[in-house]
């Protein structure tokens, strides 16, 4: 080998470094996956409804049917609110995960704008529990069995 061989290697280092920088920038440009997910850690099938506030007001949506030991995405994309509200029903053993925040639901699949006057508008007034995402851009909720503080009998 000649004495100039090490210089040949050094001439290509900037190109290799540029490739690494370009790859890094491409990875940074890839959108991050950010969603609100719910995992059913119980042995039952459950039905789930969600409530949230966006710039146009309050919305409730349902029902997601979530099999035992699986997860579902309830809200796709970066979370726009700090607080989300959940109501879930245990289809197999009865009981529900509920709370004090009353929002509108329906028996069949629904998207309802607004949370006022549910019954007068032909919907049910249903108790939802609050989930504080602490302003994270994605969050996973885990519903557990009653023995672990999960669904309460109706």
Range-by-range predicted roles:
Residues 3-19:
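Bacterial N-terminal signal peptides that target proteins for export
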Residues 19-20, 58:
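Short, functionally important structural connectors and interaction interfaces within domains
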Residues 23-31:
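C-terminal segment of classical bacterial N-terminal signal peptides
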Residues 30-39, 43-77, 88-154:
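Intrinsically disordered, low-complexity segments enriched in small/polar residues
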Residues 80-86:
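Short, Lys/Arg- and Gly-enriched loop/turn segments at beta-strand edges
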């Amino acid at each position: 080998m000649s004495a100039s061989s090490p210089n040949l290697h050094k001439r290509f280092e900037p190109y290799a470094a540029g490739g690494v920088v370009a790859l890094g920038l491409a990875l940074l440009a890839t959108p991050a996956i950010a969603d609100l997910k719910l995992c059913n850690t119980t042995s039952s099938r459950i039905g789930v409804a969600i409530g949230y506030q966006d710039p146009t007001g309050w919305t409730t949506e349902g029902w997601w049917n979530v099999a035992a030991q699986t997860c579902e995405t309830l809200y796709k994309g970066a979370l726009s609110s700090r607080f989300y509200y959940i109501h879930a029903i245990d289809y197999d053993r009865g009981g529900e995960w509920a709370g004090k925040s009353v929002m509108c639901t329906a028996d069949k699949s629904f998207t309802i704008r607004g949370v006022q006057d549910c019954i007068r508008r032909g919907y049910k007034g249903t108790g939802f529990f609050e989930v504080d995402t602490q302003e994270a851009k994605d969050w996973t909720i885990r519903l557990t069995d009653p023995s672990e503080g999960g669904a309460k009998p109706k």
